[in-house]
Amino acid sequence: MEVVTNGSMHFDPQIHTLPFVRARSSFLLAVILASASAFTALGGTRQLHLSLRAHADRLEANVRNSHLKSIEIIQAFLCLATWAEVPTILCRDRTWSYVSHAISLAIELRLDQPLPHCIQSDPMYDQGYNELLIRNAHRTCLLLFIHDRVGIILTYVSG
């Protein structure tokens, strides 16, 4: 997780440790592992990447079908949007789907609030992680805004 948290604006190295991510969201963990396995310098192979990506896709379908909501799920969709493979055909680009679903989850969880309810009800909130969890929610909300704006700008530029 150290490699991921040091080079990514998505995660906070103080809370996004391997035990934290493992305990909170198997979907986020699978997405991180699938994204990291795409880079052979980190020890990934093509077969490993395909297996992890297929697992992440199965978990994504489960998350959507079960209507699950959490900040970690939003972060997983942001990672999928950020590290998505460039499709050979534009109609296969799923970035818009990842970002739009993440935005709808953020709206439902009210991440734009100064103190989102999902943070107040978090078991870690009472364990001294208040500021880190609030900052995590606000960072996620800001990244969604950036993804949305960049997508609109690219749409205007490209056509």
Q: Would you name each region that the model predicts?
A:
Residues 104, 109-159:
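Fungal transcription factor middle regulatory core
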Residues 1-80, 88-91, 103-108, 112, ...:
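Acidic, Ser/Thr/Pro-rich intrinsically disordered transcriptional activation regions
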